[in-house]
Amino acid sequence: ATQTSFAEGLKKEREYFMQCLESPQSAGLRHAFFAEREVSKVPGIDKETPVRDCSSAAVIGAGTMGAGIAYSCLSAGLKVKLLDNSDEGLERGRKIVEGLFAGGVKRGKISESEMEQGLSRFATTQDYTDLADVDIVIEAVFESMAVKKEVFGALDKVVKAGAILATNTSTLSIDEIAASTSRPGDVIGLHFFSPAHIMRLLEIVKGAETRDDVIATSLALAKSLGKIGVVVGNCFGFVGNRMLYSYGRESQLLLLEGAAPEYVDKTLYDWGMAMGPNAVGDLAGLDVGYKIRQERTDLPDDPRFYRVADMLAGMGRFGQKTGKGTYLYEDGSREPTPDPEVDALIRAEADKLGVARRDISEDEIIERCIYGLIVEGAKILEEGIAIRSSDIDVVWMNGYGFPRHRGGPMHYADSIGLDKVYETVCGLKDRFGPLYWDSPKLLQDLAKSGGRFADVGD
């Protein structure tokens, strides 16, 4: 446009602008913009729904997650008490909180005065009775139902009537946790994502008895924390982690079938994911998923299911925190390096399981991992766990690194056409069997009618 006359330049710029406007990337970004504003519309919750006072909080568990949640609440102006069962834990948590404030000052995000004000509202304790007067408690302890029930039972005895009891569980039943208290209506899931002070997503998980004003207050809290609160229903893993299991399942199977971890990761990263699944596993810690799977009783009858990750976790290869997981991390580096030992272990495991190894294309990696997400997302929508398909997109764009220009997994499926998606899923079922590739009825019906996931619930 700069090489022609002004009039011709305008004409050329308009031509290019229209190409951008009509592109799939533009559609995806516009969808993301409106989807993030739609999530606040929750059936039964409106401007008339009362909101409880939420000016003070307690956080149970002074690990990295708990300290990050405490810092987020302090930054939003709340008074915060951090509880842990050991002096060492509390000292570690305090140092994390102080370090986050100091980092904010160093980067020019906050002033010294703001840091001092924030820390003046911060206290630590090992005594549950010190939490008697807080407005909300956020539990962030180990992902074990027995441990969480013990914590909620203790809170139920000391926390004032009307306080909200929230759990940061990433997978466990809100209703089962709530049943350990005498006030299930006050219990809700607030699933923060790590690092809690940075990640924008907050999954707000309502139980069968969660009161409307508790949901409304949680949405208001999310906003005050600078997060996008997405209200979801109660099931294993809720929306995000339930879908992650399907995504991770396929990436794990691909390793046994012949794709190297770095090949899988690079393929999905190049497609647009913020990180590859194997790098994500090492970052989060392979022991986390391993322990969750050890507690589950409803895993598929398939010896290949997360076989590689569980094998590595069983060897103490947890990821970055141990210096080796799926990858090697030399001298404390966060940069993953392919490990020949892992390659040999995967080959031996595939041989033991009778899995024939072969060359796998980039297209197959993308298709199986992304369509695994879509199929699980369709089930979630069909079951009413998500209010609308765009809520699922918001979860995956803001919590799991799904490329924003693709608009989230459900929008991506709609953009392809659900008839084509259904056809592809049927092909995957023919090739790999029905265990993971049975099409949900919702997908079948929409494919036949020419509908979209976006139309569900309208």
What are these regions (language model features)?
Residues 1-458:
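N-terminal glycine-rich phosphate-binding loop for ADP-containing cofactors
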